Amino acid sequence: MLIHPQFDPVALHLGPLAIRWYGLMYLAAFIMFLWFGRLRTRQPHIAAEGWTGRDLDDMLFYGVLGVILGGRLGYVLFYKPDWYFAHPLDIFKVWEGGMAFHGGFLGVVVAMMLYARMRGRSWMQVTDFIAPMVPCGLAAGRLGNFINGELWGRVSSPNLPWSMMFPQAQGEDREWLLSHAQEAVTSGLQAVFDQYHMLPRHPSQIYQFLGEGVLFFILLWLYARKPRPMGAVSGAFLLGYGVFRFAAEFAREPDNFLGLLAANLSMGQWLSLPMILIGIAMLVWSYRRAGNGEKNQAHA
């Protein structure tokens, strides 16, 4: 078993200014977007569509606005609507935390639709272009979660070699022991808690960093290197992220104020299901549309 090292959330101090690790992760995500975006503009089928570095800069600006506004509103509406409707001014306290990926995703979609309209492009053409770079941002975000010691995983077996104890989760650990008293004794978890005053948990932030971040980036980047029908790369992103996130949620601790919902699924899983279905539908539509186009050309 491992113990979370409890990193200082502040990476460095510049006079009165505190630079936090999580902020640096956002910066890393933006830099990787520009770096891999420029590599993508050099791919022949992408260059043929006229993408330039200027487009990347503009899309990053709109994307940042979409992530921040959508992520915050998504958290407010999906996770704690009762609280924020009763305390509306707290919506603006973003420094206290509270961002939702699914909300940020919708925010980016809206931002890219506006950008596409301004540039006279199809919004699917825009989302197909940016989709392969998005997992880089996901990886950076999950690494930031791990450094902050937040969004930890569910209680795991003490025999799991990479299980990790999170000092910040001690309150949730006690709640788990109260509701699983018999299981805690038979599994040896009570003995672990008696010794360390913490319970071993899945380091789900690392699972998500490796899954929906690193592995998903590699797979989607390789898929998008070749010309694909319009909408296919966007559909592959929705399907892939939805599957990775749905699977990771089985190891991630549900939000304390929500718990598990219908069918013992978490909010993250319920929000991922539509992404999976829409992703499949987009892939089917995309390839059928491309196939029909080839048939029409053959009969012309």
UniProtKB/Swiss-Prot annotation:
- EC annotation from Swiss-Prot or TrEMBL: 2.5.1.145
Decide whether keyword Manganese is in the record: no
Keyword Cell membrane among record annotations: yes
Q: Which InterPro entries match?
A: Lgt
Q: How does it sit in the membrane?
A: Multi-pass membrane protein
Positions annotated to bind a 1,2-diacyl-sn-glycero-3-phospho-(1'-sn-glycerol): 142
The UniProt entry's GO biological process terms, in alphabetical order, are: lipoprotein biosynthetic process
Q: In which pathway does it act?
A: Protein modification; lipoprotein biosynthesis (diacylglyceryl transfer)
Instruction: Cite a single Pfam family from the UniProt record.
Output: LGT
**A GO term from the CC aspect:** plasma membrane
* Root EC class: transferase
Q: Which UniProt keywords apply?
A: Cell inner membrane, Cell membrane, Membrane, Transferase, Transmembrane, Transmembrane helix
> What is the documented function of this protein?
Catalyzes the transfer of the diacylglyceryl group from phosphatidylglycerol to the sulfhydryl group of the N-terminal cysteine of a prolipoprotein, the first step in the formation of mature lipoproteins.
Record-linked NCBIfam families: lgt (TIGR00544)
Q: Which family does it belong to?
A: Belongs to the Lgt family.
**Annotated protein name in UniProt:** Phosphatidylglycerol--prolipoprotein diacylglyceryl transferase
Task: Please tell me the species this chain comes from.
Answer: Ralstonia pickettii (strain 12J)
Q: What is the lineage of its organism?
A: Bacteria, Pseudomonadati, Pseudomonadota, Betaproteobacteria, Burkholderiales
